[in-house]
């Protein structure tokens, strides 16, 4: 089962490697990882997407709390939350395929950010499912040349904050 963890940690040298080391030492896979400083430059927020059952997730959370740099851990899937991912995709198309790429980009509320005679580069933001659906929608009419995805970022909805 897909899980998203939000981790608030000190913005210190080595903090990221200690979290990654915890996952690799225990054989847990990280599907995606994003990390950046928060509005407080001494803190970073890390969003980790992983796969596991309730028991595995509980173990991961307990181990994360033991790390000295980690201040808070929250599973975003446990309540109302918003999540987004950004994707850049380079698409090769001609004729009808170019029209379909433009049409699908509009439908999915993306942006064409670069154009050459044979390629479009499209930027799209949304849930992972939305990005996957966009890729599926153009596979039959164009060739996907290259894809770069940011990984999931997310926050709890409403008054719940992580400080």
From Swiss-Prot:
Protein's UniProt keywords contain Transferase: yes
Catalytic activity: 2 pyruvate + H(+) = (2S)-2-acetolactate + CO2
Gene3D superfamilies the UniProt entry points to: 3.30.70.260, ACT-like. Chain A, domain 2
Entry-linked Pfam families: ACT_AHAS_ss, ALS_ss_C
Activity regulation summary: Sensitive to valine inhibition.
Broad class of enzyme this protein falls into: transferase
Domain named ACT: residues: 4-78
EC number: 2.2.1.6
Pathway: Amino-acid biosynthesis; L-isoleucine biosynthesis; L-isoleucine from 2-oxobutanoate: step 1/4; Amino-acid biosynthesis; L-valine biosynthesis; L-valine from pyruvate: step 1/4
CDD domains the record matches: ACT_AHAS
GO CC list: acetolactate synthase complex; cytosol
Keywords, in A-Z order: Amino-acid biosynthesis, Branched-chain amino acid biosynthesis, Transferase
Gene Ontology annotations of biological process type: branched-chain amino acid biosynthetic process; isoleucine biosynthetic process; L-valine biosynthetic process
GO molecular function annotations of the record: acetolactate synthase activity; acetolactate synthase regulator activity
Misc. comment: E.coli contains genes for 3 AHAS isozymes: ilvBN, ilvGM and ilvIH.
Assembly: Dimer of large and small chains.
Protein name: Acetolactate synthase isozyme 3 small subunit
Organism classification: Bacteria, Pseudomonadati, Pseudomonadota, Gammaproteobacteria, Enterobacterales
């Amino acid at each position: 089962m897909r899980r998203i963890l939000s981790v608030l940690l000190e913005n210190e040298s080595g903090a990221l490697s200690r979290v990654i080391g915890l996952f690799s030492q225990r054989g847990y896979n990280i599907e995606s990882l994003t990390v950046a400083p928060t509005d407080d430059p001494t803190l970073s927020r890390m969003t980790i997407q992983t796969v596991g059952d309730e028991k595995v997730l509980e173990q991961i959370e307990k181990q994360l709390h033991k790390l000295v740099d980690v201040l808070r851990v929250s599973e975003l899937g446990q309540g109302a939350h918003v999540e987004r991912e950004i994707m850049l995709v380079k698409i090769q198309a001609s004729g009808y395929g170019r029209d379909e790429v433009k049409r699908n980009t509009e439908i999915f509320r993306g942006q064409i950010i670069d154009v050459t005679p044979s390629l479009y580069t499209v930027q799209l933001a949304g849930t992972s499912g939305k990005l996957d659906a966009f890729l599926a929608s153009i596979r039959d009419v164009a060739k996907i040349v290259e894809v770069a995805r940011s990984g999931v970022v997310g926050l709890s909805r409403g008054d719940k904050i992580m400080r």
